[in-house]
Amino acid sequence: FRSREAGRIVILGGDFNEPSHLDWTEATKDMRDHQGLVVPWHVSVMLEKDGFKDTYREIFPNPVTHPGLTCPADCKDIALEKLVWSPKADDRDRIDFIHYAPFEGLTLTDVCIIGPKGDILRGQRETEETSDPIMTPLGIWPTDHKAVLATFHLK
């Protein structure tokens, strides 16, 4: 945060291991085992209050049409039992993010998910149709998380 105060571009990305409040909304409370909950997840709320933008939600603001699920990803080369965390639940969520602090001359131009199209759903490998832009890997995908790729233009 000191870098931002010093006039530097700040881009923060990674596996946050926590969903976003922008995904657990009134519109999604009855989806993916959210159990009717609207949750103000701490990390995303804190980042938003500090002025950071969620790249995926900036391009795709609707979590119903573009959930952007990143975990658990179906890695065909990994035994299913190593990928399943909650075999009776739909625990798919978007927990991998790229956030950025607005900066003069910096424009977000595109964002996509990188990884396999399939997910782990209720202990099974599933591939559902999605409107999310997914760039599939050419080779073996090594993790149970999909990645996020954001493209920026800097003047």
What is the predicted function of each stretch?
Residues 2-11, 17-155:
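Metal-dependent phosphoester-hydrolase catalytic domains
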